[in-house]
């Protein structure tokens, strides 16, 4: 599945656009698939912030706010917000409640007990 990601950086009026390609179609997504998509969104955000930097080797799903929201043209989008930027990916042909549950499980599974930052 190809997902368009629109990235908005704080203090910058330009909207950056990236494409994420994920091999699994949404109907078969697991929390692991959604975690991979969320991490790809965060890597795309890092690239927009500093195009010359190498991609982050490790990305953790914490310190961000997220929401699943209906898309104007059908389906839903995943929106992430971190301190310095926000990103929206989609649309995804899936019920909002289903994707919300997958995101919740993906973020919970990525938590590492005992690790603060």
Residue ranges and their predicted role:
Residues 1-117:
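Positively charged, low-complexity terminal tracts
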């Amino acid at each position: 599945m190809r997902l368009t990601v629109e990235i908005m950086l704080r203090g910058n009026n330009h909207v950056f656009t990236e494409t994420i390609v994920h091999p699994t179609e949404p109907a078969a997504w697991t929390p692991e698939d959604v975690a991979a998509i969320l991490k790809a969104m965060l890597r795309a955000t890092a690239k927009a912030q500093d195009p010359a930097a190498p991609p982050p080797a490790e990305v953790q799903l914490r310190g961000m706010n997220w929401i699943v929201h209906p898309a104007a043209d059908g389906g839903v989008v995943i929106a992430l917000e971190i301190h310095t930027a926000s990103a929206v990916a989609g649309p995804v042909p899936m019920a909002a409640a289903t994707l919300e549950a997958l995101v919740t499980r993906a973020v919970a599974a990525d938590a590492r007990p005992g690790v603060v930052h």
